[in-house]
Each structure stands twice: as structure tokens, then as C-alpha cells.
Curated annotation (Swiss-Prot):
Keywords: Ribonucleoprotein, Ribosomal protein, RNA-binding, rRNA-binding, tRNA-binding. GO terms for biological process: translation. PROSITE patterns: RIBOSOMAL_L5. It comes from Desulfitobacterium hafniense (strain Y51). This is Large ribosomal subunit protein uL5. This is one of the proteins that bind and probably mediate the attachment of the 5S RNA into the large ribosomal subunit, where it forms part of the central protuberance. In the 70S ribosome it contacts protein S13 of the 30S subunit (bridge B1b), connecting the 2 subunits; this bridge is implicated in subunit movement. Contacts the P site tRNA; the 5S rRNA and some of its associated proteins might help stabilize positioning of ribosome-bound tRNAs. It comes from the Bacteria. The gene is rplE. One of its GO terms (cellular component) is ribonucleoprotein complex. The lineage of its organism: Bacteria, Bacillati, Bacillota, Clostridia, Eubacteriales.
Amino acid sequence: MARLKDKFSNEIAPALQQKFNYKNVMQIPKLEKVVINVGVGEAIQNSKAIDAAVGDLSKITGQKPVVTRAKKSIAAFKLRTGMPIGTKVTLRGDRMYEFVDRLMNVALPRVRDFHGVSDKAFDGRGNYTLGIKEQLIFPEIEYDKIDKVRGMDIIFVTTAKTDEEARELLGMLGMPFRK
């Protein structure tokens, strides 16, 4: 069992139930899934760029990413419908908890001038989005092997009804919010 999942069921869930006075254990907010998205704009000119992004993302998450394709053609960007423009991975269960654990305890502390993540990136429905500027913060990525520094979006989808509940949940899981 993942370390963070164990901590959630033994410590965090009872604390949340007490704080928000939930009558039923099913009301306790929990992490549903984590979606990691890498937009690869240069894939329009260079088709090899998408393969590099897929490789990086599979090393980071331990799961094969799905290639996202353009829904519409946009002439100004020389983009056609169906062209690959990014990759994404949806993590659930133990893999999700292991990734979140690695992100919070290993990757985020490696960011230069890191003072915590913004607590303003909640969407009003209890989901949190985190933008990362470079994939090098993950120890699985070797500096010499990358072709280009790429950023990524990490979306934490929770069952929380409000942002306050989601903030409390992520804070207890170890998300380093800015003071």
C-alpha cells in the first residue's frame, strides 16, 4: 500500500471528518485522480518532439501517456484537425498516491527559489491545478538526455465540494502552500 494512501486512511480522513463535522464517511473529500498534461506546441513542425514528451512523461509517471490531438484546424498556427499537439496521463489508485508523494517530497523541493505553491489555483469545485515550468525537477529525468525543457500542468481532482475542503485535504497530504 502506498505510504500516502495509508496516511490518508489512518490520519487525514478522521481529521477531516472531525473538522468539517461529516456524519457519513462517504462525505469525506478524497483525491480521485491526478491528470498530468504536457502541451507540445512544436510538434507541428517537429514530429519527434511528441515522442520525447511521451518518453519523459512515462518515466515520470510509470504509465504510458495518451497522445492528445487537435480538435479543430487553426490556419494561423498551421494546425490541422487530428495533428498530435500534446500528451497526458491520468493516474488513479496507488500509482496516483505514489506520484503525489514523490511530487511533494522530492520534486517540488528541487525547484529553484521555491517558496510554496499558490493557493489561488482552485477552480471553485474543489479541484487544484499546478503548473510546472520544467520536467527536470523529477529525479527520473536525466539532464543530459533531454532535448528541450518542457513544462506541464498537474491537475488534482478531488471529491471535495468546496475549495476550502480541497485546500485542507491537499494541505494535510503535504502540499506546500505559500504562507
